Amino acid sequence: MSAINSIAASPTERLPGPLVFTLAAGAGLSVASIYYSQPMLDIIGKQFNVGVGAVGMVPMLTQMGYALGILLLAPLGDRHDRRVIILIKGLLLVAALLLCGFSGGLNALLIASFATGLTATVAQDIVPASAALAPERSRGKTVGTVMTGLLVGILLSRVVSGVVAEYFGWRAMYWLAAALVLFISLALWRVLPRFTPGTSVSYPRLLLSLAHLWQHHQTLRRAALAQGLLSVGFSAFWSTLALMLSDRFHLDSAVAGAFGLAGAAGAMSAPLAGSIADRIGPARVTLVGAGLVTISFALMFLLPALPLPAQLALIVLSTIGFDLGVQATLVAHQTLVYSLAPEARSRLNALLFTVVFIGMATGAALGSLALARWGWNGVVTLATLAGAASFALRLASRHLKN
């Protein structure tokens, strides 16, 4: 029996730190692939000589591919060896990223971006794999560490892509990403044991069970819709930030990517939000989080009244606020959803994140449209209304429950 199998079979030991780190790195590098384009949109648009609305389709189709991949591919982890799935999807993600880097025009980049989103859902296979490997007594800590890796991947993706695109070109970012994903995919194949499938149910029946879970659990529907609305504002902001900073402040993609550092508070708040949800209840955390998101976006209506340095400071402050609110609300919604049917957590997770990334795709599309037609105030209005709608939904859910 290998060392990994021995440790995974023991209920009293923790997984080795290097294994947990590899899982966290795999989740982070995989999900980062769907965010690299955002700080580079201005550079890509200029190279292909297309407008804001057209280049905004890149993040939209990436998010759409991710949402579809979660819905159609994530359930396969219940039926097949996750080790094999992680390797295959990782190699397909490498191919998609290379296609992005070698795209000769916008249409080719759009197709490759959709494929990138579809295959980047390997991150949603790595997180359940970590839960399956970890002994029960340390499972929460292990999954939390892997989720932190995923969130840090989202955060650093914008910072790294902004810098790489500015100094080496946007294509170099995709080539670098492909190399990193190839390395971590092979590393995961080497360290992971084989997984015994949890069910022999056919693939069509797995998909049908998703519909049953969605129809049966009202709490799931409300949580998914509320988080999806927050994702609309979140994605609208990040999908248009680089374009706005270039137009209004004449800042390059490296600076736009550096704004991702302001999201560190959001990434680091995930464990804290979970602890608070345990003490005061996840429903209250969702209300506070949605309210914080709404207020943070609304503050940016003050930008025209401020001098330029103060405008940048306010954008940073708002970014910290809404990122914190979005991540805290997500953790609380996961707590609500996972308690509904423990035996179906993978599928519940797939449904929740499908709606989240539909919101991401919608926000990217509407954000680009709003920026092109109404400027930055249009983006701020869209994001604020989406946050307010999420807050109203959580408030209504609480009143109905009472």
Task: Identify what each model region corresponds to.
Residues 5-14, 192-225:
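Juxtamembrane intracellular "pre-TM" segments in multi-pass secondary transporters
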Residues 68-106:
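Conserved MFS/SLC helix-loop-helix module at the cytosolic interface between two early adjacent transmembrane helices
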Residues 70-81, 269-282, 371:
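Helix-to-loop junctions at the C-terminal end of transmembrane segments
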Residues 108, 138, 145-192:
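Helix-loop-helix hairpin linking two adjacent transmembrane segments in secondary transporters
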Residues 112-150:
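Cytoplasmic helix-loop-helix junction between adjacent transmembrane helices
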Residues 122-134, 326-341:
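Intracellular juxtamembrane helix-capping segments at the cytosolic ends
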Residues 284-332:
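C-terminal transmembrane helical hairpin of 12-TM major facilitator-type secondary transporters
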